[in-house]
């Protein structure tokens, strides 16, 4: 890695050992459905909820998606400002703090 500076990776375009162009593109499904009904039910139980309406599950997924989009957007902003390509735990901690949700136990 001498002489290339920071972040100077060499890209190979096929051949032995290198990855060529991908033949198939991965289909992005709606990953929010990965937050299952039992997972939402467990979170509600932890919060002291006894009975849950059937309409709650989709609403919870929507709210969680918006929340995570905001936190991830702020985290990536911190990462880009520091000229890094890896989002650190501290980026997420600072993003949460910016939104008024201070998180303890992850440094800082």
From Swiss-Prot:
The keyword Cell membrane does not apply. It comes from Mastigamoeba balamuthi. Core component of nucleosome. Nucleosomes wrap and compact DNA into chromatin, limiting DNA accessibility to the cellular machineries which require DNA as a template. Histones thereby play a central role in transcription regulation, DNA repair, DNA replication and chromosomal stability. DNA accessibility is regulated via a complex set of post-translational modifications of histones, also called histone code, and nucleosome remodeling. Residues 1-24 are annotated as: Disordered. InterPro entries: CENP-T/H4_C, Histone-fold, Histone_H4, Histone_H4_CS. This is Histone H4. SUPFAM superfamilies: Histone-fold (SSF47113). The keyword DNA-binding applies. One of its GO terms (molecular function) is DNA binding. PROSITE patterns: HISTONE_H4 (PS00047). It is found in: Nucleus; Chromosome. Keywords: Chromosome, DNA-binding, Nucleosome core, Nucleus. Residues 17-21 bind DNA.
């Amino acid at each position: 890695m001498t002489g290339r500076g920071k972040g100077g990776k060499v890209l190979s375009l096929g051949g032995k050992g290198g990855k060529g162009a991908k033949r198939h593109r991965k289909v992005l499904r709606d990953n929010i459905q990965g937050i299952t009904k039992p997972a939402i039910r467990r979170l509600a139980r932890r919060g002291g909820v006894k009975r849950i309406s059937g309409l709650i599950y989709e609403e919870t997924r929507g709210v969680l998606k918006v929340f995570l989009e905001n936190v991830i957007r702020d985290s990536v902003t911190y990462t880009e400002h520091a000229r890094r390509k890896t989002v650190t735990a501290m980026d997420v901690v600072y993003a949460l703090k910016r939104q008024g949700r201070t998180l303890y136990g992850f440094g800082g």
